[in-house]
C-alpha cells in the first residue's frame, strides 16, 4: 500500500506540474509558432508522457510489463480491452505510427489535471456513451475515421466503454467501430491486456497498484470487412478473438 500511495502522489504531481504546465509553456506555444507541425508535436508529447508513465510505474511501484507482439509504424485501427486507468498510456506506448485518436467519455473533457487539456489538444472525439449518437458526436467520429482513412492518424478504441469488475471483456459498444470500419480501410489490430483488474479506479491504484504484473498480447493484422453488411459480424469476430486471447493469458 505504501509504494502504491507514493506512486499515486508522485504521479499526481507529475500530471499537474510537468504535463499540465508543460503543455501551457511548451506545447501550445510550439503549435502556435509551427501549426503545420501540430500532429508531429502532439504525437511526440503523447508518446513521451505514455512512456514516462510506464517508467514511473516500474521504478516507483515495481510494475512489470510483458508484451508479445507489436504494432506497425503506420496508420492503423487498434481495438483494446479496458481494465484499468493505465490502459491509455499502455495503448499509446504501443502505437508507433501516427498518433491515435481515442474516443473519450465526455465527462473527461474537463476536470483531470494534465489529461483533460491534452485530450482536447489532441482533438480526441468526446462521446456521451448514450445509445444514440448526438449530431456533434457523429460528426467528430466521422471526422476521426476520415483522418484514419487518409493515413493522417491512427485510432485507439476501447469499445467496451466501461471497465468490468473482474477484468473480463464486456459487451462492445459498436457505434465508434461501425463508423470507423465503414470509412477507413486500414489494418486492424487487437491489444489484449491482463493483470490490471484490481486497479480499475484511481482509488484502487492508490492502495493496490504496487507490484502489478501486466501482460499484453497483440493480435492481427486483420483485413477490414469487405462491405458494410459484414461489419457487425467482423466486430463479433474481434470480440471472440480478444476473449479467447484473454482466457489464454489467464491460463498461462
Locate predicted features.
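Soluble extracytoplasmic domains of inner/organellar membrane proteins
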Residues: 142-146, 155, 160-165
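Generic preference for hydrophobic
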Residues: 67, 102-103, 218
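Membrane-anchoring hydrophobic helices of lipid-metabolizing enzymes
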Residues: 1-76, 89-90
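Catalytic core of membrane glycerolipid acyltransferases/transacylases, capturing the structured
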Residues: 27, 32-36, 41-43, 76-132
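Residue-level preference for the first positions of well-ordered beta-strands
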Residues: 75-77, 152-158, 187
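C-terminal alpha-helix
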Residues: 237, 241-249
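A cross-family acyltransferase "interaction/gating" segment
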Residues: 113-116, 154, 165-229
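Cofactor-binding loop segments of dinucleotide-utilizing enzymes, especially the Rossmann-like FAD-
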Residues: 105, 160, 193-194
Amino acid at each position: 500500500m505504501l509504494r502504491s500511495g507514493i506512486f499515486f502522489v508522485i504521479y499526481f504531481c507529475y500530471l499537474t506540474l510537468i504535463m499540465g504546465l508543460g503543455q501551457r509553456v511548451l506545447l501550445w506555444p510550439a503549435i502556435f509558432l509551427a501549426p503545420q507541425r501540430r500532429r508531429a508535436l502532439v504525437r511526440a508529447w503523447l508518446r513521451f508522457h505514455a512512456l514516462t508513465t510506464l517508467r514511473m510505474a516500474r521504478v516507483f511501484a515495481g510494475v512489470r510489463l510483458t508484451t508479445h507482439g507489436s504494432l506497425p509504424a503506420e496508420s492503423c485501427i487498434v481495438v483494446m480491452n479496458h481494465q484499468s486507468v493505465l490502459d491509455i498510456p499502455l495503448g499509446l506506448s504501443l502505437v508507433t505510427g501516427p498518433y491515435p485518436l481515442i474516443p473519450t467519455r465526455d465527462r473527461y473533457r474537463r476536470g483531470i489535471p494534465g489529461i483533460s487539456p491534452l485530450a482536447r489538444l489532441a482533438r480526441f472525439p468526446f462521446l456521451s456513451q448514450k445509445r444514440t449518437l448526438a449530431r456533434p458526436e457523429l460528426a467528430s467520429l466521422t471526422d476521426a475515421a476520415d483522418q484514419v482513412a487518409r493515413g493522417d492518424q491512427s485510432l485507439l478504441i476501447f469499445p467496451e466503454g466501461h471497465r468490468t469488475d473482474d477484468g473480463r471483456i464486456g459487451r462492445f459498444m459498436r457505434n465508434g467501430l461501425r463508423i470507423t470500419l465503414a470509412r477507413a480501410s486500414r489494418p486492424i489490430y487487437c491489444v489484449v491486456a491482463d493483470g490490471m483488474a484490481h486497479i480499475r479506479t484511481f482509488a484502487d491504484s492508490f492502495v493496490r497498484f504496487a507490484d502489478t504484473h501486466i501482460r499484453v498480447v497483440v493480435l492481427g493484422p486483420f483485413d477490414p470487412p469487405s462491405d458494410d453488411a459484414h461489419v457487425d459480424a467482423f466486430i463479433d469476430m474481434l470480440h471472440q478473438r480478444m476473449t479467447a486471447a484473454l482466457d489464454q493469458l489467464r491460463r498461462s
